[in-house]
Amino acid sequence: YNLGFYKEKQDSVDTDSVKITQVFVPVTSFIHTLQVDLNNRKYISYDDAQNQKYFEHNYLGTDSIDKTKRTSIKNTIGIALQEGFNKWAKAGLTAFLSYEYRNFALTDTTNIPGQRIINNYKESSLSIGGELSKKQGKLLHYNILGELAIAGEDAGQFSVEGRGDLNLRLFGDTVRLDVNAFIKNQNPVFYFRHFQSKHYWWDNNDLSKIMRTRLEGKLSLNRWGTQLRAGVENIKNYTYLANASIPVKDSEGNVTGFKNNAAVRQYSGNIQIFTAMLQQKLKVGIFHLDGEVAYQKSSEQDILPLPELSAYGNLYMKFGLAKKVLQIEMGADVRYFSKYYAPDYSPVIGQFYNQNPDDKIEIGAFPIVNVYANLHLKRTRFFIMMYHVNARSEER
């Protein structure tokens, strides 16, 4: 809901006449938002013999269905002083208050074999925040947003985010400089603190808040299709999922396999991440080339593994036929990243986790080439692609 005033605006109709209209100028806005999230996840596994062989734990016995639910209701009220209602209001200012209620339903066991109950974990969080922003004009824009949790499960959690862009005309082109930064002190998500399922189970009540600080800059040259980005980030108390599988040995002590398990880990030190990226788009007639090269470095590769070098290229033709009624785009793209210990995937929780240190596999340093054709005829689109054409025929 907006409060403001009307002012007169003059528009020239003819050389000898002027039209005067009333234009509403908002000064103050009252804000209310309601966000309701309902999430369900069901893990189904009927092969109990395989489960007993593959997993270290089977907490729910022979149950084939494992379910978890999450409900979140968030109310936010605020008041905003609008930007530009007079010549002194160079920026907009907003203050808000948020309350969030969360409920997590997890399956639990009892002392009676085969009996299951639902454990409900209820959390709430009350936070205050503010925003300062400048959206009008062509030269400079910025936005600063801060929020602090003052009560509830997340008390003490805070975040301050800022972004801005400066647009300059240089040699007939627009040069844009973007700067983004944030500092966040956040509570680990609920499922890192508590989780109960058929194969994984943990309660971590001693996890510290995660402190993240990031600074990033981006330079864009519109005419040349060039974009250069670089950023640094520091993470303290990085919290992650790890593959905690245990080895299975034969009578002679040789490892014959692993019993799968997962666990939450928290690294109490600092992890630094540096990222630099170059994006370039070229066009000559109907031929297009889009390229991207990125370099990133993690100070703790065992904790937060990243490929140092990754690249993407897309070479294609784009043209129209039949008076441009049929639009055609066809070409090939290639993806590449250097070798690194990529995370494993766990279907039990639908998440990636760090590889088991006793059974690590390094992947990468091999390009993946795809060819494709994309045809657009009025309201109908046809798309065909052959994936990884450079693989050997028996591996496709």
Give residue ranges: language-model regions.
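Exposed, low-structure sequence patches enriched in small/polar residues
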Residues: 2-49, 55-56, 60-396
